[in-house]
Amino acid sequence: MTRISREMMKELLSVYFIMGSNNTKADPVTVVQKALKGGATLYQFREKGGDALTGEARIKFAEKAQAACREAGVPFIVNDDVELALNLKADGIHIGQEDANAKEVRAAIGDMILGVSAHTMSEVKQAEEDGADYVGLGPIYPTETKKDTRAVQGVSLIEAVRRQGISIPIVGIGGITIDNAAPVIQAGADGVSMISAISQAEDPESAARKFREEIQTYKTGR
């Protein structure tokens, strides 16, 4: 296994769907399947917060979501659980600034995809130095899904990172909908991530498809 190329990573970040069982009222596995069918390019298993599954139920959901990803040919990323990621032979892991040390995680996971959330220029540079394949920058917009988020910062950090000539793949995180995704890509991000914009949509497949079409248009047009 070799590390993913930056070009491939930038493509995969286009429509980055993140979801746990508690982010939808529908059957979570079905929602993941529909999002993938609609065109999600990457999926992150994020089972956190109130009503989150634990123990065997959590592992079973992860396995089913991973199977859906395999069937769709979409990489399966685990949020902040190196042990689970390694046990499942996931395609990658995503960690926040309050989670494990990125350099140590890189050493533990080998060539798997490593994503790191960053909120400042120094955190972006540190993530790149530590071996991150991409950074998640945000929160771009206000969000209800994550209760522990930092101050909303819009697209200013994305623009600043690109102005400095830093080419690490970037995905925008936080409060992104089909109506406000364009500025994120125009600022220099390679994709957008979303939870509720797909997980709580009446038709997750259609919602994912709209994101895929819009993001491709924005990326082509800049």
Curated annotation (Swiss-Prot):
HAMAP family in the cross-refs: TMP_synthase
An example molecular function term from Gene Ontology annotations: magnesium ion binding
Residues that coordinate or bind 4-amino-2-methyl-5-(diphosphooxymethyl)pyrimidine: 44-48, 79, 117, 146
Protein's pathway: Cofactor biosynthesis; thiamine diphosphate biosynthesis; thiamine phosphate from 4-amino-2-methyl-5-diphosphomethylpyrimidine and 4-methyl-5-(2-phosphoethyl)-thiazole: step 1/1
Complexes and interactors: Monomer.
Reaction equation(s) it catalyzes: 2-[(2R,5Z)-2-carboxy-4-methylthiazol-5(2H)-ylidene]ethyl phosphate + 4-amino-2-methyl-5-(diphosphooxymethyl)pyrimidine + 2 H(+) = thiamine phosphate + CO2 + diphosphate; 2-(2-carboxy-4-methylthiazol-5-yl)ethyl phosphate + 4-amino-2-methyl-5-(diphosphooxymethyl)pyrimidine + 2 H(+) = thiamine phosphate + CO2 + diphosphate; 4-methyl-5-(2-phosphooxyethyl)-thiazole + 4-amino-2-methyl-5-(diphosphooxymethyl)pyrimidine + H(+) = thiamine phosphate + diphosphate
Cofactor(s) needed for function: Mg(2+)
Induction: Is weakly repressed by THZ and not at all by thiamine.
Cofactor binding note of this UniProt entry: Binds 1 Mg(2+) ion per subunit.
Protein residues bound to 2-[(2R,5Z)-2-carboxy-4-methylthiazol-5(2H)-ylidene]ethyl phosphate: 143-145, 175, 195-196
Official protein name in the record: Thiamine-phosphate synthase
One GO term describing the cellular component: cytoplasm
NCBIfam families in UniProt: thiE
UniProt GO BP: thiamine biosynthetic process; thiamine diphosphate biosynthetic process
